[in-house]
């Protein structure tokens, strides 16, 4: 029994345990399911961005929860780490905010964990949060130094003068790195790169500026600009060994001085340069005058060259056979040849001269236009003597072919010499022919065995290695006999008689071609023609009592052309004295105006040491126009040279322009046209060998109008036949600025054209006067006269009274003119405007002149009428009563005056007028009484209208003489007419 009880209790306990374990197991499964639902509330990680100046964090992805289950969030803090954030639950979203504004420069990112809190207080699973602080460009770059100061040497180019550096406190490369530097004042010769390195772009000069102050800024990569800082770059003066006191420009005026010192204030600054032994110092200087661009390489004056030989000019300027050539007018005429032009010299100059039998010389000055592609077979003749008909044989010629100067001389037929070879062609291979420069060539031909060539005054000498080939001499047979065939001499080409045309033309410019017949030019003649009139004068060594002669320690040399001087001295004092005495001179009477460059080179050397080359000095001489005296007459220099002989220089001629300086014209005259220069005279006289000689030719004249013409109503034309100047050698060009006349012709022809110029103006009221300036020139426009000025004054008519229908009697008009004859004649004599060829002009001019001399103080009726109307309108009614009361008295007076007036008119028309003196024209209104009927309104309006009409017809009234005098007589008869 006891066993059964015990067993029963054991079963009950066992069952209870089973039930207990079963309940525990069920509860554990429910708890795991609940926890699993909590873990999916948050993501494993979140990433956030926050700007420095904001507090809201942008979270990706969004923290989404269910507010029915989640009531809060919690940030899990770690020890020793500050988490400046908070999280709030708003509308099922977790909003993460910063407790304060963050600073990227202090900390760029934050890492922490968050969890959601269920409403029952149970926490959810945790999630990692990574927040990055976004930088804001809140800081500008700042330089490490507040300013920079540095000193540099002048005259140097530095790769880097100094380096400036700036930094930025922002934390990201975009805002925190400096990407650019800039110099704000761009006018300074400096540059800066992106690394802050400053260098100069040109050598600095202490004289120009001893301190350069730069304003420099820096930019970060977002181009935020820093505050500027000052960079001071001081220029340290460096002593440079060189000549100082050398002028940049030297003015030279012909006729002012015979010679001109170039460097009167020259001083050599040696700085600290010295030799161990002072006697070992040597200073070398060279002064070069560069005139290649002037005229033919320099100014040449052959006016003083004298020669016993008869020189024929085959290319004279102004000759009949050279008129068709294209040329430049100037001191030395230059003829242009293009390969298709040339001229034949008339037989009257050289009559079929046999060049093979007599000695002769050819002198020429030309510039050959060499081409890139040279045809080796093309001949370009300077001078050529060939058959005049039947054949094309060349007897004598000077031509260029394949950059060689070739001279041809064929012997004529002589019995016994037909089969004998003799030199016939000389070929010089010289660079001067094809260098496009001017060169002077002289050929002296004494016989067929001796031909000498001179280039720029220097005799051509062949070198040893090519003495047999330069010149290359070609032998040939004499020409065959040809009866009745003469020669034609051509310049710039060669005459081909079978084709009857010029051929083998020259390409280039030729200034002169001359020949000396029966004799050759001497060395003195050649040198005189090629010597430059302008050159440098070397200083002369001087001897003092206390010092050694300069020649002991110094050397002075100059070249043959006298355009270079070499000076060598042993000390600073000597070289300075020599440089100060170097002079320039130009002996040509009329030097070429322009610039001549001067170059000075200096070197220093000590014995057994390397030499030091000083900076070259570039300056120039400016040759100016000769100084001319003021006034109309001007002295000019004669630079003409006779074509047949070398004549001595002549004295300067004078061009004198004379005439009236003022001309008065009326409206009617200027509308029809006036001869502006009808009283002009031109004279040109020169003094030669103490005798006065008249120069009958001038080259150009110009008439300048001031102000310029208005083509709408002004005009200048040639009176009568517009082709007047075309029959002469004068070309006339008329434009709004005046008249230009060009062409060499006689003075009388120029005067005829000038006097025929007619100026007209359809609207003369626009101008009070006109100014015409006349100037003329001689000798290819080299010498100009002074300006002759003529002032043309327009006489404006005086405002006339209202027009009257009465005409002035002719007898009264005649008396007025006769009475004023003396005054008018003297007035016109002074003004110089009398024209004896026009009988109507003096009469008309007197009327205008008289109105200018005698001004009458008479008010116009229009003003009187307005004045009276104003008073009448302002009168009281009582004025009408007073006027009516006196009406009878006025009526009686009016009738009496009317009868007297009619009687006076009858007497004036039937009796001669007495002579009217000048004072009679002065209006005396002391006894005049004017009464106007205020009721006669229409009379007033008619008079006013008539006065206005008279203003528009003032010119017609003036034409009628003194017709306005009758208007001064008061006629009150119409007052009583109703």
From Swiss-Prot:
Membrane topology type: Single-pass type I membrane protein
Cytoplasmic membrane side: 898-978
GO cellular component assignments: cell surface; extracellular region; plasma membrane; postsynaptic membrane
Glycosylated residues (UniProt): 53, 304, 486, 608, 823
Chief location of this protein within or outside the cell: membrane
CDD domains registered for this protein in UniProt: Cadherin_repeat
Residues spanning the membrane: 877-897
Region (Disordered) residue spans: 937-958
Ranges per topology, Extracellular: 27-876
Disulfide bonds listed in the record: none
Residue stretches in coiled coil: none
Biased composition, class Acidic residues, residue ranges: 948-957
Cadherin domain residues: 37-143, 144-249
Keyword tags: Calcium, Cell adhesion, Cell membrane, Glycoprotein, Membrane, Postsynaptic cell membrane, Repeat, Signal, Synapse, Transmembrane, Transmembrane helix
Alphabetical GO biological process terms: calcium-dependent cell-cell adhesion via plasma membrane cell adhesion molecules; cell-cell adhesion mediated by cadherin; homophilic cell adhesion via plasma membrane adhesion molecules; positive regulation of synapse assembly; positive regulation of synaptic transmission
Record-level Gene Ontology MF annotations: calcium ion binding
Assigned protein family: Belongs to the calsyntenin family.
Function recorded in the entry: Postsynaptic adhesion molecule that binds to presynaptic neurexins to mediate both excitatory and inhibitory synapse formation. Promotes synapse development by acting as a cell adhesion molecule at the postsynaptic membrane, which associates with neurexin-alpha at the presynaptic membrane.
Free-text comment on this protein's domains from its UniProt entry: The cytoplasmic domain binds synaptic Ca(2+).
The protein's name: Calsyntenin-1
Organism annotation: Drosophila melanogaster (Fruit fly)
């Amino acid at each position: 029994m006891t066993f059964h009880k015990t067993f029963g209790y054991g079963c009950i306990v066992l069952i209870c345990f089973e039930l207990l374990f079963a309940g525990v197991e069920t509860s554990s499964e429910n708890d795991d399911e609940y926890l699993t639902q909590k873990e999916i509330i948050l993501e494993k990680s979140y990433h956030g961005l926050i700007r420095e100046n904001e507090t809201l964090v942008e979270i990706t992805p969004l923290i989404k929860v269910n507010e029915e289950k989640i009531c809060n969030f919690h940030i899990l803090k770690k020890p020793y780490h500050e988490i400046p954030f908070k999280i709030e639950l708003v509308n099922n979203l977790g909003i993460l905010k910063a407790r304060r504004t963050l600073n990227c420069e202090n900390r760029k990112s934050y890492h922490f964990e968050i969890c959601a809190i269920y409403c029952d207080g149970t926490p959810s699973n945790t999630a990692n949060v990574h927040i990055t602080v976004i930088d804001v460009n809140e800081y500008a770059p700042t330089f490490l130094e507040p300013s920079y100061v540095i000193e540099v040497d002048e005259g140097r180019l530095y790769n880097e003068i100094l380096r400036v550096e700036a930094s930025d406190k922002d934390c990201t490369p975009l805002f925190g790195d400096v990407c650019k530097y800039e110099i704000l004042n761009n006018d300074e010769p400096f540059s800066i790169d992106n690394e802050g390195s400053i260098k100069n772009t040109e050598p600095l000069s202490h004289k120009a500026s001893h301190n350069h102050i730069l304003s420099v800024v820096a930019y970060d990569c977002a181009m935020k600009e820093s505050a500027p800082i000052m960079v001071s770059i001081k220029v340290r003066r460096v002593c440079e060994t060189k000549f100082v006191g050398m002028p940049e420009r030297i003015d030279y005026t012909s006729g002012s001085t015979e010679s001109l010192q170039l460097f009167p204030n020259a001083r050599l600054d040696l700085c600290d340069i010295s030799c161990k032994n002072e006697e070992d110092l040597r200073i070398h200087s060279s002064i070069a005058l560069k005139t290649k661009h002037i005229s033919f390489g320099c100014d040449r004056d052959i006016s003083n060259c004298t020669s016993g030989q008869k020189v024929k000019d085959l290319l004279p300027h102004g000759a009949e056979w050279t008129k068709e050539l294209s040329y430049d007018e100037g001191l030395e005429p230059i003829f242009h040849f293009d390969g298709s032009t040339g001229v034949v010299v008339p037989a009257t100059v050289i009559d079929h001269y046999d060049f093979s039998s007599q000695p002769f010389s050819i002198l020429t000055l030309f510039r050959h236009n060499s081409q890139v592609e040279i045809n080796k077979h093309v001949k370009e003749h300077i001078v050529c003597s060939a058959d005049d008909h039947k054949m094309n044989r060349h007897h004598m010629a000077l031509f260029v072919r394949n950059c060689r100067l070739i001279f041809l001389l064929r012997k004529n037929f002589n019995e016994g010499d037909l089969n004998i070879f003799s030199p016939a062609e000389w070929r010089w291979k010289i660079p001067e022919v094809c260098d496009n420069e001017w060169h002077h060539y002289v050929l002296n031909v004494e016989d067929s065995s001796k031909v000498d060539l001179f280039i720029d005054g220097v005799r051509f000498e062949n070198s040893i290695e090519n003495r047999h080939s330069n010149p290359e001499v070609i032998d040939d047979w004499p020409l065959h006999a040809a009866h009745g065939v003469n020669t034609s001499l051509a310049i710039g080409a060669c005459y081909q008689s079978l084709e009857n045309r010029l051929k083998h033309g020259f390409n280039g410019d030729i200034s002169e071609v001359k020949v000396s017949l029966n004799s050759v030019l001497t060395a003195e003649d050649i040198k005189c023609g090629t010597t430059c009139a302008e050159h440098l004068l070397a200083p002369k060594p001087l001897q003092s009592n206390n010092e050694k002669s300069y020649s002991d320690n110094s050397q002075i040399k100059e070249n043959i052309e006298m355009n270079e001087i070499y000076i060598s001295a042993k000390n600073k004092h000597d070289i300075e004295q020599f440089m100060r005495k170097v002079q320039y001179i130009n002996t040509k009477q009329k030097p070429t105006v322009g610039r001549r460059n001067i170059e000075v080179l200096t070197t220093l050397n000590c014995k057994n040491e390397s030499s030091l080359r000083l900076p070259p000095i570039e300056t120039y001489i400016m040759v100016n126009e000769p100084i001319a005296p003021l006034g109309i007459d001007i002295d000019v220099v004669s630079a003409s040279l006779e074509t047949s002989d070398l004549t001595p220089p002549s004295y300067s001629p004078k061009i004198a322009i004379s005439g009236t300086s003022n001309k008065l014209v009326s409206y009617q005259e200027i509308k029809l046209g006036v001869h502006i220069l009808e009283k002009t005279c031109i004279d040109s006289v020169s003094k030669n060998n103490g005798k006065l000689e008249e120069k009958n030719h001038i080259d150009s004249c110009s008439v300048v109008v001031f102000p310029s013409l208005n083509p709408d109503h002004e005009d200048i034309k040639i009176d009568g036949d517009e082709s007047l100047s075309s029959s002469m050698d004068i070309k006339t060009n008329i434009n709004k600025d005046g008249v230009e006349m060009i062409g060499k012709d006689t003075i009388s022809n120029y005067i005829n054209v000038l006097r025929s110029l007619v100026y007209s103006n359809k609207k003369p009221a626009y101008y009070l006067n006109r100014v015409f300036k006349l100037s003329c020139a001689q000798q290819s426009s080299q010498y100009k006269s002074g300006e002759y000025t003529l002032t043309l004054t327009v006489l404006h008519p005086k405002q006339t009274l209202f027009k009257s229908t009465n005409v002035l009697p002719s007898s009264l008009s005649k008396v007025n003119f006769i009475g004023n004859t003396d005054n008018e004649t003297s007035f016109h004599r002074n003004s110089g405007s009398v024209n004896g060829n026009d009988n109507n002009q003096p009469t008309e001019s007197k009327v205008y002149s008289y109105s200018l001399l005698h001004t009458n103080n008479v008010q116009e009726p229009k003003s009187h009428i307005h004045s009276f109307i104003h008073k009448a309108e302002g009168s009281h009614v009582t004025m009408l009563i007073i006027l009516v009361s006196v009406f009878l008295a006025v009526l009686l007076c009016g009738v009496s005056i009317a009868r007297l007036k009619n009687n006076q008119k009858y007497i004036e028309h039937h009796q001669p007028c007495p002579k009217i003196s000048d004072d009679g024209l002065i209006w005396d209104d002391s006894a005049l009484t004017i009464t106007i009927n205020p009721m006669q309104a229409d009379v007033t309006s008619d008079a006013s209208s008539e006065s206005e009409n008279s203003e528009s017809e003032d010119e017609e009234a003036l034409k009628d003489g003194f017709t306005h005098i009758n208007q001064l007589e008061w006629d009150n008869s119409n007052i009583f007419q109703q």
